[in-house]
């Protein structure tokens, strides 16, 4: 019933309330409360199930109505109650929402009367009661109407006809997908070494609804080796839909290219790309303007124009942001919302991690257990850190004060509520400053920071929570009046909603991080962060909703660290594949004569600049030098330019636009001799293909350790706590493993194909430590360079060997 109503019965405007609605937990509690009050003889969660024929189609229609009051006598028909929770008076609900609620109840009424008729009853009428429960007032608002069979049959018939005609079109497309996927052949003449093993393992995993972890070196073809078997599983109807999760645009591009190859060998399949709302919003892109009440004209009458747009996109091979924008313009619809409406009808969906794992923005329809959806998680080495961020939330006193001031003129009540939150944040911090109850994790002239548990209600910042709830209540009241807060506080509101969301799901993996900045200033900055130490449990819970999941990356090591961070069971298959390329094509040189630790950086500058120059002049071409921070990068660039003014290095800049990034990458072309300076873990260090002569070497400066700050220290301390059942060292969890992941990802830019040749320079004495040696890929043939002079000799020898091997091949 829910699926039918959602598809066929929405009319009018797309409604945004301006804030989060009632949570699932609030809705469940309200339902249970009202169901307990039901009179004797009434049934809660009454199951309705009917079989019927409509438009030549056999239909099984089922659902559960909240309360059934059986027919008491001939003069009093049976009554069905449907409960909906709200934060406002039902009279202030948008008409679109009220009609949608009533549509669901009418379909339930139709099912009930048909169920009675199919059992021989002559009942012709049913009483339907919509019960809106106002969570703020803790009060019910019932609305009741009597419906006869003829009216309900007509209403349900119209809804079913719409759905059946759509479903037939979708089934025709689906049969094409199944037939072409079944006969699909691998789009290359041969498998690379390791590719077939990966494809077979991936197929078995998805067929059996299992999980698989894959570390496969760069260049092996992870995308085709996971997508191809997954699509074969679609063809055999083992799966209904594939979700390909990737965090970077470069990852999306590889998926597009892979699907294009499969289309080229006969596959008929639709791919939908979900982009962030901010990147597709027509108002933000200047394509339309909101009215005086903040309403986007593309949301007005959205559901009335949606069917035509949906029909136009069904079965299209490429439902990309560009294709969505074009159709959205034609039908004057919101492009982002149109993409969400197409989500159930695409065969492959490419999107960011957050649409599956983020508790605030995840798309609930993706986790419908009735459908067999599988996850393909690319760049899985980034997932644990991203997930910790998704399950964390923070508030700033300074940002809250700015938000309050922005509301002062036009929304005085909201201003007062936010000011109360500003005071509550200061009071929470003063508790730490004055009572010395909790351990300081940092204290300097400018900053104080404490961590505290969140295990019990007594430990939690209740005053802050109450202040937030009052702000949310006021926002709901404004929304009911058709008023909205100023756009300039939009980002602050997102942080407020996230805090309210995370507060509802706090676990033993959360701690409070409290900071006081400018501690001696007249107006101090206070920050409160609900910080997730390990999101493994949340990831595990999310993955359980899907029919199989494959996590893959070029760097997923060591296994124990990865499984603990991703919530993967120890018995899960873990596939570690060798490099498909000739090891001698890659020279790896360890340079222990350079010390890049923070306190030694100034003294290391001459040796480091000399090292970079030696590598570059050993064979001029395209090189990238990677640093752990922009500050260090800038120091080296300035020193390098003084010593080698004839070379004009390129450098990555913070906050670069997409166009600036493309220009940077465009400088690394075949035949060029570009020397670039970039950041480890940044956009140029992961997911970028530098094929052939586009990159012949990387110089990795330092071990990539994350910057020491309160968050990383809290992460380290939490992992070392006696109650934490981890066999992995806290310093390794917080610093060394994430750093080494960056190093290995960065090194993977060099060799991308069988014909590539290049060098990797590990510039730091710590790389000689046994900890790091144990993490190096097996195919690395490492040479130690004890001085700059020796490095030059080794590089000369390496490039000479490469020239000879190329000549021999030719």
Question: Model regions: which residues?
Answer:
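Metal-dependent nuclease catalytic cores that hydrolyze phosphodiester bonds in DNA/RNA
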Residues: 1-71
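Mg2+/Mn2+-dependent nuclease catalytic core
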Residues: 50-153
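Conserved pre-motif I regulatory segment
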Residues: 172-215
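A substrate-engagement module of RecA-like helicase motors
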Residues: 178-181, 185, 238-349, 357, ...
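Walker A/P-loop
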Residues: 207-229
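Signature of the SF2 helicase/ATPase Hel1-core->accessory helical subdomain module
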Residues: 226, 331-348, 353-472, 554-568, ...
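A contiguous, basic/glycine-rich beta-loop/short-helix subdomain that forms a polymer-engagement track
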Residues: 324-349, 360-366, 471-595, 603-604, ...
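Conserved RecA-like P-loop NTPase helicase motor core
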Residues: 592-603, 654-767
